[in-house]
Amino acid sequence: MSKSENLYAQAQQLIPGGVNSPVRAFTGVGGIPLFIERADGAYLFDVDGKAYIDYVGSWGPMILGHNHPAIRQAVIEAVERGLSFGAPTEMEVKMAQLVTDLVPTMDMVRMVNSGTEATMSAIRLARGYTGRDKIIKFEGCYHGHADCLLVKAGSGALTLGQPNSPGVPTDFAKHTLTCTYNDLASVRQAFEQYPQEVACIIVEPVAGNMNCIPPLPEFLPGLRALCDEFGALLIIDEVMTGFRVALAGAQDYYHVIPDLTCLGKIIGGGMPVGAFGGRREVMNALAPTGPVYQAGTLSGNPIAMAAGFACLTEISQVGVYETLTELTDSLATGLRHAAKEENIPLVVNHVGGMFGLFFTNADTVTCYQDVMNCDVERFKRFFHLMLEEGVYLAPSAFEAGFMSLAHSNEDIQKTVNAARRCFAKL
């Protein structure tokens, strides 16, 4: 029995499913999850001593690669001053200034501890600000595990085959209207059915929780126009895309202005951090200046702020996103060519530093139904073949992949060569 197998057997007796987040259990692909001992650069090293080229990147945060020296040093220095104070710090102010400088649509920002906290709080704020109850989200999009958002959600919910989670009261879910991603007509229909009741739309600008689905050109501008027409707020959930698609996020890449933005993953540099922010008028409705309550014991803690500040400082350097995009383009092109050589039908979507693989005969994949029509069983086989080759992809057909600046051209060529061998076995 390998060390991973032994640890998993122990973990299953102590932790539900043996993991602290469902997708890690390999439920979506079968088999025993890897237990990781350490990571460095573009590589993970499991407890059995095997190395893997990593395209999960801790599910997005590791844009600089693992164990980056600047982040590591910032954390060490912060730890020496104390772990948490329960009081404001200078680093919170510096971090808020940096975030609002980098994302111009955010006049003000509130730090939290996770992406789920960010989206949950932003929706509460939108409801409080507008005095309305209903929200619009999109089928297959995942915005964390808050009750109102686990309605036809993507990501882990899709991986488990449970689009709706037990434990979410019907009375909560009835306020969530679900529309079709990339389909403006479905959104207009929802607004027209409840013209004075919708507080906000929340949307992933690139849907990264039903793999990787970029928006059609008219989609995000159309959402902005509909929100303006019906008096609702537009919340762009950039937990995944923020600082990954572009320095100012997917909202800048696609030229759309939200009322509120949610951030996570990269903003923490690998530490648990989330944030939400937006127009000053809306943000001032938050306690203590306004009536909408939100709080957190460890929000803005000095260790996480130090890691996040170091990460954002590094990725603000000239040429970072050109390099990241070139690396992702190279991987996507190589995978397409390798699949074609082996007569494997494959669609590869990619934007900035994220990508998605779809085993399908379709020419494009643009919505939830397209994703559900893909060959999940073939993905499962491909995943395990690649794992044997030393390439770690997301263990689910419904999760995006992530490039880092630590990946080299050699890493990408190794990945493409491995994929070619795996395609030949499918």
Swiss-Prot record:
Its cofactor is pyridoxal 5'-phosphate. Its EC number is 5.4.3.8. Pathway: Porphyrin-containing compound metabolism; protoporphyrin-IX biosynthesis; 5-aminolevulinate from L-glutamyl-tRNA(Glu): step 2/2. One of its GO terms (molecular function) is transaminase activity. It comes from the Bacteria. Keywords: Cytoplasm, Isomerase, Porphyrin biosynthesis, Pyridoxal phosphate. Homodimer. This is Glutamate-1-semialdehyde 2,1-aminomutase. It comes from Yersinia pestis. The lineage of its organism: Bacteria, Pseudomonadati, Pseudomonadota, Gammaproteobacteria, Enterobacterales. The gene is hemL.
